[in-house]
Amino acid sequence: MTTRTWDDLPPTLRRRITDQLAATGPAEPVAGGFTPGVRVQMPQDNGRAAFVKAIPAGDPLAGMYRTEAAINRTLPPGPRPRLLAELDEHDWVVLAFEHIEGRHPDLAPGSPDLPLVLDAVAALHPPLTPNPYPNAPQFTGHPVVAQAADHHEAMRGDTLLHCDIRSDNLLIGDHGVHFVDWALAHRGAPWLDVALLVPQLILAGHTPENAEKHASQVPAYRDAPDNAITAFASSITTYWVQRAGQGVPELRRYRKRALRAGRAWEAYRRR
């Protein structure tokens, strides 16, 4: 994957971003992400910093940037970075967020980060119910659940779900766990966000049984219909089978690992 840099942006657009954010220093590259967009951090005159991401307007992923901006405009205050600015001009889509000083959590067995993450996930949904983003699609239309049609009712709900809770979309800072990158948000039942975390725990080294024990600490997951969770495990595994060979190399490698985790989870659920 060829990652674009700050210098790839037109000079006029760079000045617009700098002025709008009241930046006081150079744009420093930020590593990470599965997209080829620009990712930089910029110091501001208020003593804080902004995280800026940008992608050409013609890129297939530009729509996700626009969706992420639209969702963030509706989110209530909470454990997530504030949207500071958005620009859709000069053939680029640019988003600027409050920079969160923190680290990605360790989800491995025995990690002290695990209870922090689980508590944060449990607290995430009440402020997002009812769903504040009117254009959020129901999760029953997500490609993950194509094989789980008999369990659509258990997946329905009016909570805004993150739908991509992974270690790299979480930051632990001075004020707890923050959820970043809301581009895939859907509307549905709160247990789904927890179910999506289960394969991530398996990827981090947990057995499927242990991963489910941790997930069950969240009431929404503990109270979810057992057969719906099993159908979901099967569906997400099928989804990764279909997607394992797609995307940029980094994403393909992740999806192949996720597929192994999904198969282990499905086998455990159907034992």
Residue ranges and their predicted role:
Residues M1-L21, R257-R271:
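Regulatory N- and C-terminal appendages and interdomain linkers associated
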Residues L9-Q20, A123-C163, G173:
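An alpha-helical support segment within catalytic cores of ATP-dependent transferases
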Residues R14, T35, R48-H90, D106-L124:
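A conserved alpha-helical element in kinase catalytic cores
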Residues I17-D45:
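ATP-binding glycine-rich phosphate-binding loop
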Residues H90-R103:
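Conserved short submotifs of the Hanks-type protein kinase catalytic core
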Residues T159, G173-K213:
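Active-site Asp-x-Gly
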Residues D164, N169, D181:
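Conserved catalytic-loop position in the HRD/HxD motif
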Residues L196-R271:
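Helix-rich C-terminal or lid/interface subdomains of diverse kinases
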